[in-house]
Amino acid sequence: MGKSSILDVCNLLFSRIMQEAAQDEQITASLLGEKDVKVGEEEAKITLFLEDQGNNFHYYRKRIQGKNLHNSKELKRVSEYIRKQYLGDYLETEEEYENDDTETPQKEFTLNNENIPVYVFYGVDRYNEKTRKLRRRYTGAAGKLDAWRDSAFGGVINFRLFFEWFRGRQEYENSIRVETPNAEDPQLHAVKKAILNALGDGFSEIRVKVTEEDAELIVIKKELELAFYQLSEGEKSVIALVGDLSRRLAIANPKRENPLEGDGIVLIDEIDLHLHPKWQEKIFPALQNTFPNIQFIVSTHAPKVLESVDENIQVIRLHEDAETHLVLAEPMEPMNGWDVNTILEDYMDTEVYNRKTTELLEQINVYLNEKAYDEAEKLVNKLA
């Protein structure tokens, strides 16, 4: 089991619980498949221990002999807790019946107006820009359950949906400015703020530009107007991820003055994906600063990411035990301020130089210890 598998397990467990809590046909959970059963084993079992405000839950799912089984009683208990705590409750409809003895009042699930935490899983294939143009407008008011819909568990970012949502909020803001010139749409304002904060210095505006033929996402970078497709892959992937997450937070927090301060759990597999080393170094601090109350669980192989996290972040290294072949999780010391070479050598068991260069350096040290300076100089010249 590797780091990606751990994120997959979290997603399999959370998605089933949230699907049951929401009772929404558009929120779907994945099932354990045969590929999830280790070769040579008869079953795969995954378990979640959950604690919230003193309430403890223990839920498991497993795959055995081609069947999917789970702890249904515990699923009901934890999903009912989440439903009543954050979503709403089932209420009886108030109807008049001709015969009260034979008619049973119907119950309907009714959402409350409280904020809800978000949960999103972003996989390695999360960003796929199929088109840069918008041809279908966002329609309809979004209920807070929309924060849990639209591939929240699927690992991918619905980029087109984000564009449509952004355009819809921008058009709404423009309409209210007819009567109130300086009015702002809180949801749009929060998303813009999140994206610009994450992109950092040099970016001053983001909006949808509409012409007679199409509509495009436009950013202002160093006073230059650029279409989305003109940005680097790193900039586009940051906009896609931050835009999707901030959109969900804006929908999930109708009563919060700053939706970016909403709560939630976000899983990101290979956070350094498609990012230049400069972006690898700044992406995690940018996410932390933009979304201060989100618990991020991320995987990475990038030393630049590891050296950027502070002492408040728990770094865990996965490695296989030589005797039991079990995958062990080992807490690591904070690596903020460490140089990349040290992280590669001490934590990733990787040589800084290639094998040929390493052998030359070792031989140079041998010659120096033997005071064979002429021979050492010849090898140094080979490295020059």
Which residues make up each language-model segment?
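Solvent-exposed, amphipathic alpha-helical segments
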Residues: L13, W165-R169, R248, L360-Y367
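A structural signal for short, well-ordered beta-strand segments and their strand-loop junctions
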Residues: V120-G123, E205-V210, I218, V298, ...
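P-loop NTPase switch/coupling surface
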Residues: M1-L161
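Amphipathic alpha-helical segments that form well-ordered structural scaffolds
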Residues: V9, K45, F121, A190-A198, ...
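Switch/communication elements of ASCE P-loop NTPase nucleotide-binding domains
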Residues: M1-Q26, D214-V352
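Acidic, Mg2+-coordinating catalytic modules of nucleic-acid enzymes
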Residues: M332-A384
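Short polybasic amphipathic segments
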Residues: E42-L50, K73-K76, A215-K222, V315-R317, ...
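Extended helical coiled-coil dimerization/tether regions that scaffold
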Residues: G143-E261, A376
